[in-house]
Design a protein with these regions (language model features):
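Ligand-binding pockets and gating/stacking loops
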Residues: 1-485
């Protein structure tokens, strides 16, 4: 049997000996093997179409160039934070006068109306009504657009999260961050285009479904980074490989990668993994600088709440989000711990703690972007996958009271990137249960977001198995023009 290799290839022994770089030269092959890509099953090829992260021009003039999503997993209570309902106070403790309550947790269900524990007041020139739990958000009321009429109708956390993140209620589909990155690429070569920051305690609930590329090419998957240093593990090479040795390694690996890619056109998983390792090399300096907030002035650190016990962690992540966008990252998402806003019980003590952790950093992010001239081109989003019910759950004493899921009417806010500041849009019924005026479903939400980036939601598509697939899932969707400046 002939041992002669195809033209242009060399044996492993010759590679090591001729290269003179030792076993470190096998790093890429080892990493690819660990990722299962060298022995991956054969997949349908995509032809010679090239998928990359080079910056791209939207087909229409666009105000938004980047987005920061502060995703509040669990479902913040709209009637306690954003949507005051005097009727709840009036009927507190009485039986809900209707029969259209849809519980997610029937075992702990109650028909007793639960009034809010907190007062509302007006803020800004616009007079936006916000809870006393959000005093800092009130300082930027004239810059945010509050939507009180969100609706998805999907009452389970996973499906509701998927609806808001991907436009579909099943897993395995691209998130909005992946779509935006696919459409526009990145403004930086030295940092990931799409970054997701988790909580110090680990991965979020439902993990990578928050940043999945789904069936889009793998290069558009989000990069998950740790909340605390080191934010990206294993970024530094051994001391013996730093400098010129590493440069020589990368030069040879690039040549080999190019030849391998030419023989495997359309294999996007392999191409994406190779590009991710090349990006890791460039990130060795850029990422450290971007994630290092020690150079920020004292007044900026204080603005975000860095050093405050109640909000230090979230303050640091919001500040890093600004620094990433400032350096050309296209899409950043900041996730909370688990489903911390899922207030089935102890809402009286849990909600103030959650608000104290997020209110100051969230408001500071808006104010800081505005001060730097970045808010006009950066969308800031604050919201979760659902809201809460107007009746109490866990009727075991006031300290135990909570609220069940509600996806038929909930609130979220957005700022910058073409959205109209100081606007309160939409209404729920007098109980805060159902959106009844100017309803915005998740398809409308995504269509409006894409419009801010310069795309028509039904024109930004990816062809798969003969179908032209879109973020809005080929469903009727409207761009909510009233939200836009």
């Amino acid at each position: 049997m002939s041992t002669k290799l195809p033209h242009g290839l060399c044996s492993r022994r010759h590679f090591i000996e001729a290269g003179g770089f030792g076993l470190g030269m096998l790093g890429l092959a080892t990493l690819l093997r660990q990722d299962g890509l060298l022995a991956a099953p054969i997949k349908p090829l995509l032809g010679n179409e090239v998928f990359d992260l080079l910056p791209k021009q939207a087909p229409r003039p666009a105000k938004a160039k980047a987005m920061i999503s502060l995703f509040m997993m669990g479902g913040p209570s709209q009637m306690d934070l954003f949507d005051p309902k005097p009727m709840l106070t009036k009927w507190h403790g009485q039986k809900f006068p209707g029969d259209n309550l849809k519980y997610d947790n029937v075992a702990q269900a109650s028909a007793k109306v639960l009034g809010s524990f907190w007062k509302f007041s007006r803020h800004g020139k616009c007079g936006m009504e916000l809870s006393e739990l959000l005093p800092q958000l009130g300082t930027v009321a004239d810059d945010i657009c509050l939507i009180r009429s969100m609706k998805s109708g999907v009452n389970n956390h996973l499906q509701a999260m998927l609806a808001m993140q991907t436009g579909r209620i099943t897993g395995g589909n691209p998130t909005m961050g992946a779509w935006v990155t696919y459409a526009l690429g990145s403004e930086t070569k030295d940092l990931p285009a799409y970054v997701v920051m988790g909580h110090p305690n680990g991965l979020p609930t439902f993990a990578n479904q928050h940043w999945s590329n789904g069936w889009l090419p793998s290069i558009y998957q989000g990069t998950f980074v740790r909340a605390t240093a080191p934010h990206i593990l294993n970024l530094d090479p051994p001391a013996s490989l730093q400098g010129k040795p590493q440069e020589r390694q990368m030069e040879l690996l690039r040549a080999m990668n190019a030849e391998h890619a030419a023989n495997h056109p359309g294999e996007t998983d392999l191409q994406a993994r190779i590009q991710s390792y090349e990006l890791a090399g460039r990130m060795q300096l850029a990422a450290k600088e971007a994630f290092d907030i020690s150079s920020e002035p004292k007044h900026v650190l204080e603005l975000y709440g860095v050093g405050r016990k109640e909000c230090d962690d979230y303050a640091r992540r919001c500040l890093i989000a600004r620094r990433l966008v400032e350096r050309g990252v296209r899409y950043v998402q900041v996730l909370n711990q688990g489903q911390s806003w899922d207030s089935h019980s102890v809402i009286k003590t849990a909600l103030p703690t959650l608000c104290a952790a997020t209110d100051r950093p969230s408001a500071a992010l808006v104010a800081d972007l505005k001060q730097r001239g970045l808010l006009d081109s950066t969308i800031v989003h604050w919201g979760g996958e659902m809201g809460r019910m107007p009746v109490l759950q866990n009727d075991a004493g006031e300290a135990k009271w909570g609220r069940d899921h509600n996806t038929y009417g909930f609130s979220q806010w957005v700022a910058g990137g073409g959205f109209k500041g100081g606007l309160t849009y939409g209404e729920t019924d007098e109980w805060g249960h159902h959106a009844v005026k100017d309803v915005v479903n998740h398809y409308d939400w995504h269509a409006t977001m894409l419009d801010c980036f310069g795309f028509e939601h039904d024109k930004l598509v990816y062809k798969r198995n003969g179908a032209a697939l879109a973020l809005t899932n080929n469903q009727p969707a409207r761009v909510v023009r009233e939200l836009l400046a």
